[in-house]
Structure formats: structure tokens, C-alpha cells
Amino acid sequence: MIKDKWMPHTVSLICFHQDTPFLVLLRGVMLQSMNGRSVQRRGDVEENEATLYIPLSVRAENAAGEDLSFLPPLEYARCTEPEKHWTLQPEGESAGRCSFFVKGEIPEACSLAEARENYDFVYVVAGWKLHDYGSPALQHWEVASRVSSHYYQYGS
């Protein structure tokens, strides 16, 4: 019950193994985004970024509903069964292929260009931190991302 209240979002994560995109559905996550401009001492500043909080206990599944397990990016790149796993590939560290996600559930894996064309809330993974200390209820990934879609709305 508490998880539903504090982690109310679903995202569709796309991760790449070589040039093949794989769809990962993450339900029970928290997405906080800032899309637009803010006024600061230096003037208007564009702030198109988001933070995705993923509990370590999240159920990650493919479109068929099969459970997937997390692998760090280098281990994922070497794995022989990428369809059974997922990862977070930050921009600039994955030989041109970085993970991105779409707010909500999408039906199938797609390229970043296709996601930008078809969905409003598209985010590119810029980096992530693993918080694997404290009680299991507090353990999570904190994923920094930048808005990559054409749609910009303050406070979405």
C-alpha cells in the first residue's frame, strides 16, 4: 500500500545489447521531472531534467510479463541472454547506445528517434547512483536523466 502511494509511476525502459533494443517495464517507481525554465540570478535557465527513483525490489518485466534481473552495464554488454536482464546505460558510456525511458507503458521496444516521435515524456539516462544501504525499503537506484521529447511543460 505504501509503495503504491510513494512509487506511483510506471516507466518503459529501453536498454540496448549491441544494436538491439529491449523493452523493460518498471512498475512502482517515482519519476520527478522539471521541464521548462526557471528564473535565477543569472537570468532564465532551462531545466529539462528528471530523476527516476527505482526501488531495488522493483519487479522488472518484459512485454510478455516475464521477470528480468538487473546487471551492471559492462556485465550486461557481455551477457549471452540479454532478453533475461536489464541495465542502466548512461549517455556517453555505452558505445553510442544509452538507455532511455518513457513515462507510462509502451507496447514494444523502439529507437530513441521513434520514442521522440510517438511519446510525450521521453528521458535519456545521464547517470545513476546505487543506494544499497539501510533497510530494504529504502534501497534504490537514483537515475539522473534529461528530457529528450518535444513536449515541455512546467511541473509535469
PLM regions: where:
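Active-site-proximal polar cores
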Residues: 1-43
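Short, conserved turn/kink motifs that form compact alpha/beta structural patches or helix kinks used as
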Residues: 25-156
